[in-house]
Amino acid sequence: GTYQSTLTYFPYLSKEWKKNCEKERLLGVSITGQWDCAIVRDPKVLEKLKNEAIRVNKKYAQKFGINQSTCVTCVKPSGNTSQTVDCSSGMHTRHAPYYIRRVRISATDALFKMLKDQGVPHYPEVGQSREDATTFVLEFPIKAPDGAICKDDVGAIDQLEHWKVVK
């Protein structure tokens, strides 16, 4: 992440934004699946992880001759990561024990043709017709692991208290 913060050439953004990126060197360290792993909801563990991320950032910022990050963020929704490793997203619980995952894909994508031929349910993007759709929405049934914590298992106050810990 510290190395990534050195990649500040954005020709489509203003010079002021480049300066801002170089000054702040924001760093995102993803801790996803928190409601699937009780240990990463432990405030003491989170504090240790935060301190380690800051320590490593400081070390590599010095090696690269750049500013240390002004903010190290350790919680992101991490939608793609959570789907890849089958865990809850970021600091959120899973939606439900069973749900439909919808994925958008180009009508010209070879993967779309293969999935369509395999019988995966697919629908044209909202506002498009089946005949001239450029984007389709695929639907995949998902079953959460047995014992997974879902949104109806955690009250609003408990969610807020957890947010305050990771904030």
Where are the model-predicted features located?
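Short capping micro-motif at the N-terminus of alpha-helices
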Residues: T70, Q83-T84
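Internal maturation/activation junctions in enzymes
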Residues: T8-K18, L26, I31-P77
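Catalytic alpha/beta core of large soluble enzyme barrels
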Residues: G1-L13, K23, P77, T84-K167
